[in-house]
């Protein structure tokens, strides 16, 4: 499996500052290892660029210019809310990215530039923030948008795939007939943490004969090693967490 990164800069969305025993499983999108201590500053002074040489050891760079100013703009537009939704959680809020029209536009443009000539007919968005980024990408590349939702959110007949959480399981669903065998799809979410949700989305689409071209996220939290759950499916991210 291959991970392609435009520029690794900031951690995103749900990152814990609380201590958690290393042998406990991590809830997707909600937990980070105890070694991660993240700044709650929005300024780019709190961000760190990885050199292209260092990054290339683990990941192929998607652009020759790893200091693309658009990436810095996207990274700095994400604010951190401490102790939300629970004490100890550093919630990295992408709503501030959406309020910044240039940063939001650049986010979509970077994905569109990557996928516009790859014969993609399906953009599958993972609930809930995949619904923000998926539709404009789908419209721009001439693909349909397929929502992948939590249980009992979609009317009519659905097909489901279960995945593991820290305590118990969850399920992701999509409509029967939303995709056809042989279609080419990308799966969009704002964040990959432990990778459980994206892995379930891959399995669900592959069960009905869809070819997964790639998973794409705004942010990767590499410390959680979520990309390892994606098997042979490559991962494309715009920014990467820096502890």
UniProtKB/Swiss-Prot annotation:
Deletion phenotype: Male sterility due to pollen abortion after meiosis. Accumulation of free bases of cytokinins and enhanced resistance to exogenous cytokinins.
Gene Ontology molecular function: any one: adenine phosphoribosyltransferase activity
Keywords: Acetylation, Chloroplast, Cytoplasm, Glycosyltransferase, Plastid, Purine salvage, Transferase, Transit peptide
Transit peptide extent on chain: 1-52
InterPro entries: Ade_phspho_trans (IPR005764), Adenine_PRTase (IPR050120), PRibTrfase_dom (IPR000836), PRTase-like (IPR029057)
EC code: 2.4.2.7
EC category name: transferase
Involved pathway(s): Purine metabolism; AMP biosynthesis via salvage pathway; AMP from adenine: step 1/1
Domain of life: Eukaryota
pH-related activity note: Optimum pH is 8.8.
GO BP term, pick one: cytokinin metabolic process
Annotated Gene Ontology cellular component terms: chloroplast
Entry coiled-coil feature ranges: none
Keyword Cytoplasm: yes
Effect on the protein of changing residue 85 to T: In apt1-5; loss of activity
Pfam families: Pribosyltran (PF00156)
Family: Belongs to the purine/pyrimidine phosphoribosyltransferase family.
Note: Plants with reduced activity of APT1 and increased levels of cellular adenine show enhanced stress tolerance and improve growth, leading to increases in plant biomass.
NCBIfam families: apt (TIGR01090), PRK02304.1-3 (NF002634), PRK02304.1-5 (NF002636)
Protein's job: Catalyzes a salvage reaction resulting in the formation of AMP, that is energically less costly than de novo synthesis. Contributes primarily to the recycling of adenine into adenylate nucleotides, but is also involved in the inactivation of cytokinins by phosphoribosylation. Catalyzes the conversion of cytokinins from free bases (active form) to the corresponding nucleotides (inactive form).
Subunit structure: Homodimer.
The protein, known as: Adenine phosphoribosyltransferase 1, chloroplastic
Species annotation: Arabidopsis thaliana (Mouse-ear cress)
Gene that encodes the chain: APT1
